Amino acid sequence: IESGANVVQLFESFAESMLKPFYEKWALPCHEKIFQNLNRDVPSILFAKEFSDLELMASSGAAALSVGNVVDLSEAIQQFPELIFQGNVDNRIIAEGDLDKISDATLNCLKQSEGKNHILNLSHGLLENTSLESVLHFINTSHSMRITNS
């Protein structure tokens, strides 16, 4: 932050391999400590890769949760309206390169969020075989649809 970052994102890349009790005992206390020690004015995001327990993730103290394909975005937003969500277009769809499927997945994600507290992103980064054409189509599709808060 002192060097110019605008947000802090904590990555828990092995979360998808953790059972809830393990996550709760070992990962969550670390997440809580990190977020508690951040200045409250600093936006923070928790990325717990493909972890579905939103209640545990929300208790971390992060202002935003990056969610993958295992989370229904519209339900997440209803359950935790005070949080911001990031995600959750399936990165495998982008990698496969079918432009119609990329459009459908992107628009579906945007519709699920209804323009509320959402940062459009992939479930977990670009896969190595993803073409530039697919990435550009994802970006252009997202720019073509504007959803405003009502």
Task: Report the location of each language-model feature.
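Active-site loop segments of alpha/beta catalytic cores
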Residues: I1-S150
